[in-house]
Amino acid sequence: MSLFRDDGIVLRTQKLGEADRIITLLTRGHGRVRAVARGVRRTKSKFGARLEPFSHVDVQFFSRGSELIGRGLPLCTQSETIAPYGGAIVTDYARYTAGTAMLETAERFTDHEGEPAVQQYLLLVGGLRTLARGEHEPHLVLDAFLLRSLAVNGYAPSFSNCAKCGMPGPNRFFSVAAGGSVCVDCRVPGSVVPSAQALVLLGALLTGDWETADACEPRYVREGSGLVSAYLHWHLERGLRSLRYVEK
């Protein structure tokens, strides 16, 4: 029997029995963790209010073994709020749909429980904080998060130099299968010809150049979002359900 303490973001919850929930979190030290929180669905439970999606929490787990992830699910025995991002996110449709896509993305990129994913965790914390504060348009925050998540997981797209031969850009064509921008000689069937403005935007989002990103015209933001969605779909092998609501 062991106690573990960590901080994490609540990704989702699901009902268990009459009063309990299974809480899925992305934690700093243990990656994705599923744990049982007992009694949190009772009306008077203050504990349950802290364990809602988007919440940044300090949690204590109880495991029957010497490791957090082992036989059966650990119990979530304590929780303290670090930052209640959900309060500012769920009241705005654009923020909510973008935030939901961010949570789903983080879970998809951390499919093995108990494996630390510190970079993904830090990206999610920063993304939700930015979204909750309303510092930039939700679509831009989401696309920046998606691009950086792809990058930290080894799928960084190229938006200038050729992704196949390295020819200096800008290059005219773009292929999700090839890894981003490609030159004339390296283009493959299915390559598209995006606007230069959309590629500049995506490069800015990937590198954190918010001055350039915030100044981009809406039509190029929409075009860029389409490229990000297609690129993410290719590498995850199936799309995000939550992106359908963002696109609406």
Curated annotation (Swiss-Prot):
Pfam families per the UniProt record, alphabetical: RecO_C, RecO_N
Residues in the signal sequence:
none
This protein's UniProt keywords = DNA damage, DNA recombination, DNA repair
- Domain of life, source organism: Bacteria
Any keyword Protein biosynthesis?
no
Give an example GO biological process: DNA recombination
Q: Does the keyword DNA damage apply?
A: yes
One Gene Ontology CC term in the entry: bacterial nucleoid
Q: Which InterPro entries match?
A: ARFGAP/RecO (IPR037278), DNA_rep/recomb_RecO_N (IPR022572), NA-bd_OB-fold (IPR012340), RecO (IPR003717), RecO_C (IPR042242)
The cysteines covalently paired via disulfide bonds are: none
State what this protein does. Involved in DNA repair and RecF pathway recombination.
| HAMAP family named in the record | RecO
- Which family, according to UniProt? Belongs to the RecO family.
Q: What is this protein called?
A: DNA repair protein RecO
Q: Which gene encodes it?
A: recO
